[in-house]
């Protein structure tokens, strides 16, 4: 529930907003063992937005969706820091069903972009403007790029202007690039991590 999520954001992260764990029991209490996956609150906030888009119910938007979306965005704001490169980077977190701690985790960066953009749209649709709106806009405009890695030549070979897969189920298929999305920067491992290994 939103009240429990607000309490947990304050208690666990010392921040405003709402935190919802990957595992939550039926009464709305979060499991504290999954507190490093930060994306569930964003996922739920986006469901609220989709419901509003489907129904165009302004009462639902102002009474239910916007409070939840705003609290999700407030929490997500605390997960990012603007570094010397001028970009907002995701602090320590984990990806889906994971335990490896990442900086600039793929899921956190993707959900940040979509959540902050959605929060700004929801506020506009409701005729509301919060003090945080400018911060969220700045984050969206200066968000760290998605984490990517270049694959080895044994996996993808450049052939003229295109690339072909050299192994796996789709061997021989043409692909756009020899770069793939990474999970993020492994804090302990000190390297970009992927679910793929050559």
Ranges and model annotations:
Residues 6-29, 99-106, 142-155, 172:
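Short, charged low-complexity intrinsically disordered segments located at boundaries
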Residues 71-126:
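Acidic/histidine-rich catalytic neighborhood
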